[in-house]
């Protein structure tokens, strides 16, 4: 028997729990994006020695250098036929020929319009031709005037005096081409004078140099020393050569003796200084006795 479900009977549905603040939503962990490598199972045919075979292959396989391909010669460009000149159209040829033809026509017209010269008259056979007139010179000197009066007595004996013309003729073309002396010619007296002056000045300078050289050899500089002496209550200094005796040495010594006597008179009480000064005086007297 079948029992019919009455509409009064409803299905009991459990109510959904409401979310509260205390409840926390648990998130699922993210899966890694990297795909996990699946290991091949070593099971199967020759699975046990697959690893060994791999290592053997890696040892055997060595890097082989690739052979470079042979260099091919660059292909030569095919020989091109010489380019033919571009054909000029007939209209352009006609326009080019027009001015040429017009120029030829103008030249022919000018040649035709040349005026013929009149024929030269031929003299008759019996008549001689007249000589050409003589060309007079451009320069005509004045009439020569004589300073002495011409008399009947002197006409036969005295000659006519020639005077210089007042105006000179213009220089001819031949005189322009004559060789002229250059401005710096050696034959001119001024240049010769200058050359001789330079020559003598050089010679004098050479002589002076030779004299200085001889002096420097005869009197070397290290043998000169400076001396000083007193003249008219003034100190005089002079360079003296060691071999020569100065002329004013006597006056210098006299001055030194005078100064020494004054010092001795000043230090009469001091016996030690007086003895030292006396020794110096004795040395000076010995020097004077040896030189003079």
Curated annotation (Swiss-Prot):
Feature: compositional bias, Pro residues: 116-134
Protein name stated in the entry: Uncharacterized protein C45G9.4
Region annotated Disordered, chain positions: 1-213
Segments of skewed composition (Basic residues): 27-43, 50-78
Composition skew (Low complexity), residue ranges: 143-158
Listed Polar residues bias regions: 90-100
């Amino acid at each position: 028997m079948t029992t019919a479900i009455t509409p009064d009977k409803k299905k009991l549905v459990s109510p959904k729990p409401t979310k509260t603040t205390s409840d926390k939503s648990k998130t699922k962990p993210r899966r890694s994006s990297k795909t996990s490598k699946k290991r091949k199972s070593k099971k199967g045919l020759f699975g046990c020695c697959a690893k060994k075979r791999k290592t053997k292959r890696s040892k055997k396989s060595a890097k082989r250098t690739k052979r470079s391909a042979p260099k091919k010669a660059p292909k030569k460009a095919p020989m091109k036929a010489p380019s033919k000149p571009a054909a000029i159209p007939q209209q352009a040829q006609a326009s080019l020929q027009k001015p040429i033809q017009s120029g030829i026509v103008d030249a022919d017209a000018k040649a035709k319009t040349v005026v013929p010269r009149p024929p030269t008259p031929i003299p008759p056979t019996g008549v001689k031709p007249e000589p050409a007139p003589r060309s007079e010179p451009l320069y005509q000197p004045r009439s020569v005037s004589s300073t002495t009066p011409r008399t009947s007595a002197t006409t036969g004996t005295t000659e006519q005096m020639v005077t210089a013309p007042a105006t000179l003729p213009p220089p001819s073309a031949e005189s322009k081409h004559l060789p002229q002396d250059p401005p710096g010619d050696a034959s001119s007296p001024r240049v010769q004078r200058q050359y001789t002056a330079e020559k003598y000045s050089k010679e004098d300078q050479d002589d002076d140099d030779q004299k200085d050289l001889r002096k420097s050899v005869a009197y070397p500089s290290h043998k000169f020393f400076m001396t000083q002496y007193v003249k008219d209550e003034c100190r005089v200094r002079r360079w003296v050569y060691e071999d020569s005796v100065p002329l004013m040495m006597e006056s210098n010594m006299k001055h030194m003796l005078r100064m020494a006597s004054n010092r001795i008179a000043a230090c009469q009480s001091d016996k030690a200084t007086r003895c030292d000064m006396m020794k110096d005086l004795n040395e000076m007297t010995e020097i004077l006795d040896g030189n003079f």
